Amino acid sequence: MTRPDLNERILSLRKLRLAQCRTRTRRTIERRNGVRLEINGSWLVEFCSNDYLGLAQHFEIIAALQDAAARNGIGATASHLICGHHAIHKALEYELAEWLGYPRALLFGSGFTANLAVQQALLTKENDICVQDRLNHASLIDATRLAGCRLRRYPHLDVDGAAHQLKNAPEGAAMLATDGIFSMDGDIAPLRALSLVARTQQALMYVDDAHGIGVTGPQGRGCIAAAWLSVEEVPLQLVTLSKALGGYGAAVLGSATLIQHLAETARPYIYTTALPPAQAAAALTAIRIARRDEWRRQRLQELVERFRENSRRHGLEIMDSETPIQPLQCGDETTTMAMSAALEREGFLVNAIRPPTVPEGKSRLRVTLSALHTTEQIDTLVQALARSRDALATEAAPVKV
């Protein structure tokens, strides 16, 4: 018997990624000051983080984390069901449920883990089905595959497509899952229409609102609140503590029955050490600031509008997004990487997003905005984007003889 050599396979795949301009590297951040990062001794203005409200370095949140670490240590020491569920976890779950208008919340270490937990615990039969938007986050897609149920995907934002998939699978339990705000496109799911489809087809509606929480809706309560949907219309949702709230972790919110079922049966919850109490304390403080500081959302929206207006004025090919995620279409991987490198030379960090994260031929620069950015930084970035685009176009133009 001759098995495939895994090392040879890895080397072959690496060569392919190099040829396709799809290798990935990590950048080491030496220091951070708001939206400014020091990398290799140089300071760059970043337009690529998810710190939408500018809370990651907020002094009140840092103080809450330090105080909780001094009292409780740096780790929970066990899973929630053993002896890792601290009073601060309980307080955070209560605050989340009260803020978002759900009966209960359940904490997880990350949004990826939470999505795995939800589908593994609820979609337990082979003929169960999860219907998803084609551009959903990878964790939602992987969760369905790992759960062992059927996965059906509909064209992006296509409500009729979602209904069609559910109608064609009448047997088995069903879930309709979607991102609230799509992380690579920045657009918002048609939640009201999708929730109606879910109820009509007797499917459980599940919304991953990782990028909506804190950013949109009344008091920053996210996409579901912005669409004026109730718990009955969206029985289950996920929020993260790591984007607009600036920390780490996630939570799933739903009815007491659903949440208790997850706590008792979801393997990624049962067999994982609880979120560090200090992180929970930081998240609790971040939520209170996010609820209090409406000016952060107002400021963020003003910057989004300014970026879009300036980009249109310079003829930049921005996508249709009214959120802090503002992708700029570049087409092929080589062009996208070249534009990212050109921006870095001008003092900006904007990541190139390439397949398989986005579809073939749709590589882009994913510009993300923070309430901490200044109007000058926005304007200067747009000018740099236009210059890099024009420079690349000049290089690609045929030479006249």
From Swiss-Prot:
What domain of life?
Bacteria
- Give the originating organism: Xylella fastidiosa (strain Temecula1 / ATCC 700964)
The record's GO molecular-function terms, alphabetically, read: 8-amino-7-oxononanoate synthase activity; pyridoxal phosphate binding
Q: Please list the reactions this protein catalyses.
A: 6-carboxyhexanoyl-[ACP] + L-alanine + H(+) = (8S)-8-amino-7-oxononanoate + holo-[ACP] + CO2
Q: Please tell me whether the keyword Transferase is annotated for this protein.
A: yes
Please indicate if the UniProt record lists ATP-binding as a keyword: no
Its pathway? Cofactor biosynthesis; biotin biosynthesis
Instruction: State the name under which the record lists this protein.
Output: 8-amino-7-oxononanoate synthase
Query: Which family would the database say this protein is a member of?
Result: Belongs to the class-II pyridoxal-phosphate-dependent aminotransferase family. BioF subfamily.
Query: What's the EC number here?
Result: 2.3.1.47
Short name of any one Pfam family annotated for the protein: Aminotran_1_2
Q: Which terms under GO biological process does the entry name?
A: biotin biosynthetic process
Please state what class of enzyme this protein is.
transferase
Q: N6-(pyridoxal phosphate)lysine is carried by which residues?
A: 243
Q: Which gene encodes it?
A: bioF
Assembly and partners are described as: Homodimer.
Q: Which InterPro entries match?
A: Aminotrans_II_pyridoxalP_BS, Aminotransferase_I/II_large, AON_synthase_class-II, AONS_Archaea/Proteobacteria, AONS_Proteobacteria, PyrdxlP-dep_Trfase, PyrdxlP-dep_Trfase_major, PyrdxlP-dep_Trfase_small
Positions binding substrate in this chain are 24, 137, 357
Alphabetically ordered keywords of this record: Biotin biosynthesis, Pyridoxal phosphate, Transferase
Function description = Catalyzes the decarboxylative condensation of pimeloyl-[acyl-carrier protein] and L-alanine to produce 8-amino-7-oxononanoate (AON), [acyl-carrier protein], and carbon dioxide.
